[in-house]
Swiss-Prot record:
Active site (record annotation): 329, 427
Keywords: Cobalamin biosynthesis, Glutamine amidotransferase
GO MF entries: ABC-type vitamin B12 transporter activity; catalytic activity
Native species: Pseudomonas putida (strain GB-1)
Record protein name field: Cobyric acid synthase
Xref: NCBIfam families: cobQ, PRK00784.1
Phylogenetic placement of the source organism: Bacteria, Pseudomonadati, Pseudomonadota, Gammaproteobacteria, Pseudomonadales
Domain GATase cobBQ-type: 248-435
Pathway(s) of this molecule: Cofactor biosynthesis; adenosylcobalamin biosynthesis
HAMAP family xrefs: CobQ (MF_00028)
Keyword check for Transmembrane: no
Pfam family, one: CbiA
Function comment: Catalyzes amidations at positions B, D, E, and G on adenosylcobyrinic A,C-diamide. NH(2) groups are provided by glutamine, and one molecule of ATP is hydrogenolyzed for each amidation.
Taxonomic superkingdom: Bacteria
CDD domains: CobQ_N, GATase1_CobQ
């Protein structure tokens, strides 16, 4: 059994994408492979079949391996809920919230969970393809590290170091990172991958030759800059726009400080008839057909920010002019009368007034609801599938007009009496072609084009594997993976 780890010189260097690519490339070779990320910090998560929670990048990587997502693929997930603290999720279940100092002391316990998951995966699959987190050279985080070299040392695995040349300074990133590692860690780095290159590779070659001579380590290859991948971004919100048709539906998403699961909007970003805009601090909400309040890891705090930015008044004006409004998960909770946090799960215990647009209230509870669901969107009896990740229990008269009838017999969400507002706990609402088309028609778009988001994602995973085959040293990769 072989473990190979991909680490990056920076956040967003291309670790998740490279691991996804390598997983599908190995699968094409007939090799059983499983993704693994010891520790992930992200507000975008996925629900596993057994009701656990992992980072969405690992769910995509599981798809690349044609496996169902499992909590062992991401045993430690940190979901920030303040500037200094995060909810700690171990093996898919929330155990507590901690500040950075407390978590530093907890790392030894977290490492045991990491090693247990890795042991199970390595016993079941020939290759475990591991993704690091951030940079392995963060001096202040190296003590007790479980995400990068601390893990690699513990399981004795080789490492590939990837850097993003599009940022500039790629040689400084690679050499500097290597220099800051201990001698044993340096020895683990078996080669470099340069990501997001644009231009003539011949012009880069002198630098590659110098890098190999300077470090004594090979460059496994140079991956090109790819502009039209449709895979979820794990960290930042992807605001790239493609070519749009003349008649489009204008959709606005207000970006609040603790926005979660912004990947909900990737299908809209890709839709040729949708003009999706993310609105940040200091920006007014413009005229639109549809406003969507996204999920939030800190609903009461984000409600306060929404009001401070004047967006509550903009939403009221939008509704007066006949616009449509959707609230997803935390957005659903904001649309109600109150949000109560008696246990202080999101900060100081207390209650906040909601926007009062739907007649219900939410009580935040310690037990999180985690499940994959399917059902029917009541707008057009359209099939819908998604997942729930929330800690709130919502009740009130507005729920008597549910947005979704779930296959397990439960109802979800609400639709306002005038039909302008829809609230739901379901993430992934726009990924299904039927539910996406139904919601776009409800928001005012005629002659909606259906897009198969799952097919787009699968096609792009195949494209990534093609890039590995074309641009990387596959003979050395096979050697590192223990594949003949």
């Amino acid at each position: 059994m072989t473990t190979l780890m991909v680490q990056g010189t920076t956040s967003d260097a291309g670790k998740s994408t490279l691991v996804t690519a390598l997983c599908r490339w190995l699968l094409r070779q007939g090799v059983g492979v499983v993704p693994f990320k010891p520790q992930n910090m992200a507000l975008n998560s996925a629900v596993t079949a057994d009701g656990g929670e992992i980072g969405r990048a690992q769910a995509v990587q599981a798809q690349a391996c044609r496996l169902a997502p499992h909590t062992d693929m991401n045993p430690v997930l940190l979901k920030p809920n303040s500037d200094t603290g995060a909810q700690v999720i171990i093996h898919g279940r929330a155990v507590t919230s901690m500040n950075a100092v407390a978590y530093h002391d907890y790392k030894a316990t977290a490492m045991q969970a990491v090693l247990a998951s890795h042991q199970r995966l390595s016993a079941a699959y020939p290759v475990v393809m591991v993704e690091g987190a951030g940079s392995p050279a963060e001096i202040n985080l190296r003590a007790g590290d479980i995400a990068n070299m601390g893990f690699a040392e513990a399981v004795d695995c080789p490492v590939i170091l990837v850097a993003d040349i599009n940022r500039g300074g790629v040689f400084a990133h690679l050499v500097g990172t290597l220099e800051l590692l201990s001698p044993s860690e340096q020895a683990r780095v078996k080669g470099f991958v340069i990501n997001r290159f644009r231009g003539d590779i011949a012009l880069l070659q002198p630098g590659l030759d110098w890098l190999e001579q300077r470090t004594g380590k090979p460059v496994l290859g140079v991956l090109p800059y790819v502009t039209d991948l449709h895979l979820e971004a794990e960290d930042g919100i992807d605001v790239r726009q493609g070519a749009k048709l003349a008649r489009v539906l204008k959709v606005i998403v207000p970006v609040l400080p603790r926005i979660s699961n912004h990947t909900d909007f990737d299908p809209l970003r890709l839709h040729p008839q949708v003009d999706l805009q993310f609105i940040g601090p200091g920006q007014p909400i413009p005229a639109a057909d549809l406003i969507i309040l996204p999920g939030s890891k800190s609903v009461r705090g984000d409600l306060a920010q929404l009001r401070e930015r004047g967006w509550d008044k903009a939403i009221e004006r939008h509704l007066r002019y006949g616009g449509k409004l959707i609230g997803i998960c935390g957005g659903l909770q904001m649309l109600g009368r109150q949000v109560h946090d008696p246990l202080g799960l999101e900060g100081a215990a207390g209650s906040s007034q909601g926007l009062g647009l739907l007649d219900y209230a939410t009580v935040l509870e310690a037990e999180k609801q985690l499940r994959n669901v399917a059902g029917t969107l009541n707008l057009e009896a359209a099939a819908v599938a998604g997942y729930e990740i929330h800690a709130g229990v919502t009740s009130g008269p507005a729920l008597e007009r549910p947005a979704v009838q779930l296959a397990d017999g439960r109802c979800d969400g609400a639709v306002s009496a005038d039909g302008q507002i829809l609230a739901t706990y379901l993430h992934g609402l726009f990924e299904g072609s039927q539910s996406c088309a139904a919601l776009l028609r409800w928001a005012g778009l005629e002659d909606v084009q259906a897009i198969d988001y799952e097919a787009l994602r699968e096609r792009d995973i195949e494209r990534l594997a093609d890039l590995v085959e074309k641009h990387l040293d596959t003979a050395l990769l096979r050697q590192l993976c223990g594949v003949a």
